[in-house]
Amino acid sequence: MKASRFFIGTLKEAPADAEIVSHKLMVRAGMIRRVAGGIYNYLPVGLRSIRKVEAIVREEMNRAGGIELLMPAVQPAELWQESGRWEKYGPELLRFKDRRQSDFVIGPTHEEVVTDIARNQIKSYRQLPVNFYQIQTKFRDEIRPRFGVMRGREFIMKDAYSFDKDMDGLRESYRKMYDAYVRIFTRLGLDFRAVAADNGSIGGSGSHEFHVIAETGEDAIAYCPTSDFAANVEAAEALPLYAERAAPTEEMKKTPTPGKAKCEAVAELLNIPLERTIKSIILATENEGAEPTIWLLMLRGDHDLNEIKASKLPGLAEFRMATEAEIIETFGTPPGYLGPIGTKKPIKVVADRTVANMSDFVVGSNEVDYHTTGVNWGRDLPEPVVADIRNVKKGDPSPDGKGVLDICRGIEVGHVFQLGTKYSEAMGATCLDETGKPRPMEMGCYGIGVTRILGAAIEQNFDDKGIIWPESIAPFEVVLCPMGYDRSEAVRAEADKLYAALVEAGIDVILDDRGERPGVMFADWELIGVPHRLVIGDRGLKEGKLEYQGRRDAEATLLPVEDAAQTVIGKVRAALAR
């Protein structure tokens, strides 16, 4: 590629709305341009990196037995109504009517469409297993698109869907996809972790997320540095922090706590550790034809409620936060002084595992400016329903028993699910088993955010000059920077010779023949992040030398002219082989 025949849209300044490094650099490097909120043009530099991500994904999906197809972005509402997600998905699902007033959606995922394919095309277990995949544009109407491609509304995604005759087959398909994802993200040159996760709106049972580790990541990941354990904080099991409950040493006492509505303030006033206070979270669930049920969830004062865990408890699937009016009616006091003792109406109490093993703890007295100290289970309160309802924290014991947890931030770039028969049962996707009886097919789904990978890679690989691409997804592998290409015949001849040698070797090279000043050339290519740079100048040629610098190198080195091409070819191939 010659730069004079390519489009290079670099900018000196980032747009004012760009908040994170990847968004700023993708705009400045001429990779993307905003069309509307969360919707971008992918300019030639950006598209080259996208195509390289897609190529690696395609190779590994094919290697794992995936079969590529292409499904429509526009999907009829009938399919979503069959699965039940038409009502459940929420405002992120972009819905519209055609001229015949028929309802359609722009697909955020394709479970319904692929299940429709399977039920019409797969009739016997002998046709299984099968794994269909596509690389397709998706749309989710995010309420607040931000961070460039990291949380856009329109994005490119690889989504795959496996169909098996039984759970053993599904587990094998899942394992193959998990292994394929490890290979994909390794080849992409990313520092990543596979973590146990919640299935969210997709549904199903087993699930893992693949996260690129970055300080700007939206997700918190709990991991054990001394073992292989890793899980999204939403899914990580929180073990009780006390092995057993200590015997009471205090009498229950109503204690003045004027103006102290928060656990931290109560602990400071009473001169006790925050860990001895109890945080009361009040939820409500609807009952058809009757008053809502009020729930009190008890957490240690320094812990936070995990709403996903809470929603999985019997009776809490559709919970909401109780209103202030409901709280006052039930407890006789506004939020801030609530507790399980002396409520005006019956409530259901759930204690976190750690709270269930506490003694001599402090709860609200259900009276403004008062808390009750020295509270104990059995003596002062009936034994509670006990459940894991909190987020893990740094320093908690690892669920695998092999150390303590640490917390880092991650950017989700891939997700694999064992769906089971959630969609096949709802949509009648059955096949005949060995006995000739119809049974719903076991499904898995497996997604990779192709465009999000670019942003995630940049969040891990940048400096004050610009992007530092992993070799495998750089828009170009090598840039040739001739000094005075339009003025010096010797420089032009050597640059053209090097260019031809690199092209013949299959190297993705760009020759900057624009005639720009050295400072402009270097700034552009450092911003774009090309991994290898060769500078050709009259002075160096007279000495038989060319200047080489890797994008991660602090200093340039001199190479003999006759060795330069093979040296750079070797560096590129070695980097790609890692």
Curated annotation (Swiss-Prot):
One of its GO terms (cellular component) is cytosol. It is found in: Cytoplasm. SUPFAM superfamilies: Class II aaRS ABD-related, Class II aaRS and biotin synthetases, YbaK/ProRS associated domain. Keywords: Aminoacyl-tRNA synthetase, ATP-binding, Cytoplasm, Ligase, Nucleotide-binding, Protein biosynthesis. Its main location: cytoplasm. One of its GO terms (molecular function) is proline-tRNA ligase activity. Its EC number is 6.1.1.15. The keyword ATP-binding applies. Catalyzes the attachment of proline to tRNA(Pro) in a two-step reaction: proline is first activated by ATP to form Pro-AMP and then transferred to the acceptor end of tRNA(Pro). As ProRS can inadvertently accommodate and process non-cognate amino acids such as alanine and cysteine, to avoid such errors it has two additional distinct editing activities against alanine. One activity is designated as 'pretransfer' editing and involves the tRNA(Pro)-independent hydrolysis of activated Ala-AMP. Belongs to the class-II aminoacyl-tRNA synthetase family. ProS type 1 subfamily. Homodimer. HAMAP family: Pro_tRNA_synth_type1 (MF_01569). This is Proline--tRNA ligase. The gene is proS.
